[in-house]
Amino acid sequence: MNVQPTKYHGLVLDLMPNIRLMQGFGHFLFRYVNGPVLIRKLYSWWNLIMILLQYFAIMGNLVMNTGDVNELTANTITTLFFTHSVTKFIYVAVNSEHFYRTLGIWNQPNSHSLFAESDARYHSIALAKMRKLLVMVMVTTVLSVVAWITITFFGDSVKNVFDKETNETYTVEIPRLPIKAWYPWDAMSGVPYFFSFIYQAYFLLFSMCQANLADVMFCSWLLFTCEQLQHLKGIMRPLMELSATLDTYRPNSAALFRVASAGSKSELILNEEKDPDTKDFDLNGIYNSKADWGAQFRAPSTLQTFGDNGINGNPNGLTKKQELMVRSAIKYWVERHKHVVRLVSAIGETYGAALLLHMLTSTIKLTLLAYQATKIDALNVYGLTVIGYLVYALAQVFLFCIFGNRLIEESSSVMEAAYSCHWYDGSEEAKTFVQIVCQQCQKAMTISGAKFFTVSLDLFASVLGAVVTYFMVLVQLK
């Protein structure tokens, strides 16, 4: 079956580099492809089988080397490290429809002519940040893989074996491979060794990229959401100035209906008295409830007007189209905020369970790494390996928490922005609008890990606290 080329919009277009990389590394995302889907599916299944076979080989090595505590701890850390990759690879495959739904939420090109410049500016800021995040994470991932493979050639390639008969621990030479794993063939030298080495290099690159690309998509969603909230806060003050023209005399009120960006003085709405047939202002592009929110919203979305001819109904002599623009601006703000709330809800539903699995695995892994770090006595291969594991694991957790925390801060500050604007100069509609906004935004938007925790910097501190607690228990049990 072939997929015809389509023109993408919204988040799908913004995140297309991320989506293409995820598809390139084998993720089960087949909706945004051109050409035969069957080849894509075979490629994804082949990657899944190869990743699982290597993961089972790592687990086999863990099961077969349980005699020595240090060896058991090191193998457990390695197994937990790659558990992230396997779980996220499978998670994206199982929940691909949720990813499609979240990506498709922002495909409606809703905008408002008065705030189009602000919308475009914050969208470009979000796009730049998302691309920068993708580049930084991918460069870090590739450098980590290179460092992992490079450090393999330093130090002794041995493992500790505990002899139950003599109650002593001795070392045994093992293949010089990036990852300790059990294979049904002898990988000490020759063709089996080179095959095993290439296989593990592939596994390192693909497994780490698969996990990190899924995480980058989650963080990009949060970045986009935060910039949308910045946009809503930024247009709050001009929105109040506009609304004041409905029932309060404002000198030079016509200046409010001119394009302020790039020094332009062109009118957004032409004088309908001179040219009554002009149709320069189209409300169709501004949040139509039926089109944007589905058939369950049956309330009419038309804007209310007052006065006989739209001129004598307000003290500033606004035309009918100007009145519609003011009221549509308030509608735009409310519907855009609802849109953001809907996006945040979809993000939590899509990635919440993956966050829960990640945090559970990371807590155990970080505890064992902290225990291993106490045995570092020099800056050798062992010390660099443990430090690398520790920094990488902490960076993954911190990445989630910093963006989740920013979402909380940005959504909380919406109420402050609404209260700080000149709402007392606005119309009665605007005052009611500000009151509703303050009530609605009292509770910050959050992303939870399957309802068990909230992703924030407090979670990062809690994880560190739990690691220290478990570490002290392990030290006492030593």
From Swiss-Prot:
Regions that span the bilayer: 44-64, 74-94, 134-154, 188-208, 344-364, 383-403, 455-475
Source lineage: Eukaryota, Metazoa, Ecdysozoa, Arthropoda, Hexapoda
Organism listed in the record: Aedes aegypti
Gene: SGPRor7
InterPro entries per the UniProt record, alphabetical: 7tm6_olfct_rcpt (IPR004117)
Residues the record marks as carrying a glycan: 167
Stated role: Odorant coreceptor which complexes with conventional odorant receptors (ORs) to form odorant-sensing units, providing sensitive and prolonged odorant signaling and calcium permeability. Orco is a universal and integral part of the functional odorant receptor, involved in the dendritic localization of other olfactory receptors. Plays a key role in preferred attraction of females for humans over non-human hosts for blood feeding. Human attraction plays a crucial role in the transmission of dengue and yellow fever by the mosquito.
Topology in the lipid bilayer: Multi-pass membrane protein
Keyword Transmembrane: yes
UniProt protein name: Odorant receptor coreceptor
GO cellular component: plasma membrane
Pfam families given in the database record: 7tm_6 (PF02949)
GO BP, sorted A to Z: eating behavior; signal transduction
All ranges on the Extracellular side of the membrane: 65-73, 155-187, 365-382, 476-478
A Gene Ontology molecular function term of the record: olfactory receptor activity
Tissue-level expression: Found specifically within most antennal and maxillary palp sensilla, as well as in a subset of proboscis sensilla.
